[in-house]
């Protein structure tokens, strides 16, 4: 198998002189045309701290590839910032950006005949977007995570600011104190520092086998992260030499490894959505029920924010996630024979990993975990016939029954919470925020943080057909499918209806007689204003159910 399977069609022979001429214009030499071409997809942007340093890393990757027997070509794709747009109309574009990233990477690499691909990402949607693009292309590929931000000197971060906003609304802190926390909490480059969505997905990708061992926990600004980038050239050259493609690595068993890691680390509900979409892109049959099946046997062992006490940078100082993976492998909770981007199996990568220092308090033992089974619960019932995803650690209890307070947008719900209209025992329902309904399936960090900040985290439940930030904690259920926009049962809820959430029986039940629900369904009117043009209109037309990953290129859904 030639190492230049794709680029040879672009640059070889007299008839490709014009193509070569263009490439000479960007600095190619005659020798470069004899090498495999490797695209380096950078998500650099100054719109967010998560990505402001990515081009520095991309240039190290570019140099490392050029120093191997390959030729790097650096290009950019987009990023948006969930943290900046949270709670606004702009958040409707967040999940959409996952598809734009995947589409743009696929477009550039497919158009320009690259033999391999290295993608570097920071903010939440960069990771699944890059992996979806890699899966579609199915050429030797490697992902590099941009790394975590360090917490402030007071151990605060972005999520702290969100929750302090709730405390301010309640009257517990002054505006001056809120601004003080705002000013100190996000300093410099890197992704949000807890086990929020970015770190969850970076960890999942390492467990999946698509990034180099140890890379998911590194600080954004560190020698370790630079070293990770310097290793990329040798790694991608080896992958091209072996013709080791994403389809060889991203198997059903590898996805089960990723799910196991996400659960053990107490990861974000967004991992469910993104892993389903990544599996769909590579042709792996992954379902919500796989998360339930695996979750019954995998405990939560990481005491990491949002519901724990530590940050990813602290875990990195103890050895990152590799010792966690080794713990899981030793208990036969991982498939050790899965291939990885090193060309070795997961078990071979972990063979010489030492256990954590016994004095560290971040990772608990499998025998004495934080929670004995998964915090990610897949719920079904008359409110979620196609499923819903709950994030329940047990700190807030495992069952909740209360009266519905119904809102048809995030803004309406958030305002009611800030106005102190939500009381203990309520079930906040925010609907018409699903993939089609938003459109865009916004994250509900602002309202859930306001609930936590007002001291109602264990007294109020929150359900939505939208989704949650990785920073969300409390009694929350999202991804309710079918969504309100397509007439799902969540559209039928009225104020004061009783709702029962049971994370033990995995049920989400609307306690209203079926005859009444059928009458409501007959009288249901679509209240949503649909976009007529632009990316949101295209997305609404194409996107499928959250229960299948909210993908945009499966036309038989």
Predicted stretch roles:
Residues 109-130, 142-145:
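A short, small-residue-rich loop immediately preceding and capping a beta-strand
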Residues 94-103:
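Glycine-rich, highly charged phosphate/nucleotide-binding loops
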Residues 1-52, 57-78, 83-84, 89-94, ...:
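Catalytic or ion-coupling anion/metal-binding cores of large enzyme and transporter domains
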């Amino acid at each position: 198998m030639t190492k230049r399977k794709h680029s040879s069609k672009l640059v070889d022979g007299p008839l490709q002189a014009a193509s070569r001429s263009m490439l000479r214009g960007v600095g190619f030499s005659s020798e470069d045309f004899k090498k495999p071409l490797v695209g380096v997809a950078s998500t650099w942007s100054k719109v967010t701290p998560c990505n402001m340093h990515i081009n520095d890393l991309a240039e190290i990757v570019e140099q490392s590839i050029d120093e191997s027997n390959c030729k790097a070509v650096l290009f950019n794709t987009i990023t948006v910032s969930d943290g900046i747009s949270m709670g606004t109309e702009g958040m409707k574009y967040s999940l959409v950006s996952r598809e734009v990233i995947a589409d743009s990477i696929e477009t550039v690499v497919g158009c320009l005949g690259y033999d391999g691909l290295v993608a570097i990402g920071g903010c939440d949607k960069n990771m699944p977007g890059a992996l979806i693009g890699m899966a579609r292309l199915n050429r030797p590929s490697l992902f590099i995570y941009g790394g975590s931000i360090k917490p402030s000197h007071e151990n605060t971060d972005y999520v702290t600011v969100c929750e302090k906003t709730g405390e301010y609304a309640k009257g517990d802190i002054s505006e001056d104190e809120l601004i003080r926390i705002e000013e100190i909490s996000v300093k410099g480059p890197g992704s949000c520092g807890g086990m929020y969505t970015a770190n969850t997905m970076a960890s999942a990708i390492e467990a999946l086998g698509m990034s180099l061992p140890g890379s998911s926990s590194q600080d954004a600004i560190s020698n370790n992260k630079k070293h990770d980038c310097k290793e990329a050239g040798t790694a991608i050259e080896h992958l091209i030499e072996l013709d080791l493609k994403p389809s060889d690595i991203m198997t059903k068993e590898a996805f089960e490894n990723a799910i196991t890691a996400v659960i053990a680390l107490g990861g974000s509900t967004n991992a469910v959505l993104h892993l389903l979409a990544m599996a769909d892109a590579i042709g792996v049959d992954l379902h919500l029920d796989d998360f339930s099946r695996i979750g019954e046997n995998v405990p939560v062992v990481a005491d990491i924010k949002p519901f724990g006490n530590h940050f990813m940078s602290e875990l990195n100082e103890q050895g990152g996630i590799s010792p966690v993976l080794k713990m899981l492998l030793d208990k036969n909770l991982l498939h050790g024979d899965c291939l990885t981007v090193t060309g070795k199996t997961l078990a071979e990568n972990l063979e010489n990993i030492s256990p954590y220092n016994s004095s560290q308090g971040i990772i608990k033992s499998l025998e004495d975990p934080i929670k004995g089974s998964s915090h990610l619960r897949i719920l079904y019932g008359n409110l979620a016939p196609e499923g819903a995803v709950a994030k329940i650690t047990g700190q807030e209890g495992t069952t909740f029954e209360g009266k519905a307070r119904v809102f048809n947008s995030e803004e309406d719900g958030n305002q009611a919470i800030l106005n102190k209209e939500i009381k203990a025992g309520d079930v906040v329902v925010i609907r018409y925020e699903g993939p089609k309904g938003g459109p865009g399936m916004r994250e509900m960090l602002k309202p859930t943080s306001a609930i936590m900040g007002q001291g109602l985290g264990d007294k109020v439940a929150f359900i939505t057909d939208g989704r949650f930030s990785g920073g969300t904690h409390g009694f929350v259920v999202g991804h309710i499918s079918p969504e309100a926009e397509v007439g799902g049962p969540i559209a039928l809820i009225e104020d004061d209806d009783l709702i029962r959430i049971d994370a033990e029986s995995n049920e989400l039940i609307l306690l209203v007689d079926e005859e009444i629900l059928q009458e409501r369904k007959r009288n249901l009117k679509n209240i949503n204003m649909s976009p007529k043009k632009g990316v949101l209109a295209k997305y609404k037309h194409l996107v499928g159910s959250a229960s299948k990953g909210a993908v945009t290129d499966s036309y038989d859904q």
